[in-house]
Amino acid sequence: AGRTLSKNGPHSLDIFELAIKINLIGTFNVLRLAALAMAENEPNETGERGVIINTASVAAFDGQIGQAAYSASKGGIAGMTLPIARDLARNGIRVMTIAPGIFKTPMVAMMTEEVQASLEAQIPFPARLGDPAYYAQLAQSIIENPYLNGEVIRLDGAVRMSPK
């Protein structure tokens, strides 16, 4: 993380590039290889051969100060969802993206209770951190609903991140 321009100079291009490589290029690389394998599957009764579910972040839409690299990398994942869904339609492969908000993760668990309470206070309803089971439930719904394709779904309790 880093600001675009700080008293120490411009944001490190190496750090920006690393975030893009890990989050965006890493996601695309796994996606393209999964699509190659799925294209060999026998189609089901509706012609579907599989569904790819990517993970972005609400930071793709509401990036905070110091999150340019992270937001750009997650925004790229959101941005490639529809065109890749269109690309893979002829192969019977659906593509969806989940953009989670603030979830109970090992990283959040390392934060103080005060910081966690502050994060929860930003979430309109339900005013609590996301449970990983919510993500799993949404992924299952995406898999089971054959008409979901080419869309990014925010899973965030209506949170909109403040600039800071």
Region locations from a protein language model:
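Conserved mid-core segment of classical short-chain dehydrogenase/reductases
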Residues: A1-E17, E40-T46, G66-A69, A109
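Catalytic Tyr-X3-Lys loop
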Residues: G9-N29, I53, I77
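Active-site helix of classical SDR
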Residues: L31, S73
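Alpha-helical segment proximal to the catalytic Tyr-Lys
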Residues: L36, A85-D87
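Residue(s) in the substrate-gating loop at a strand-loop-helix junction
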Residues: S57
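Active-site loop immediately N-terminal to the catalytic Tyr-X3-Lys motif
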Residues: D62-A68, N91
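Short, flexible catalytic-loop segment of classical short-chain dehydrogenase/reductase
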Residues: V95, A99-M110
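C-terminal helical subdomain
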Residues: T97, S118-G157
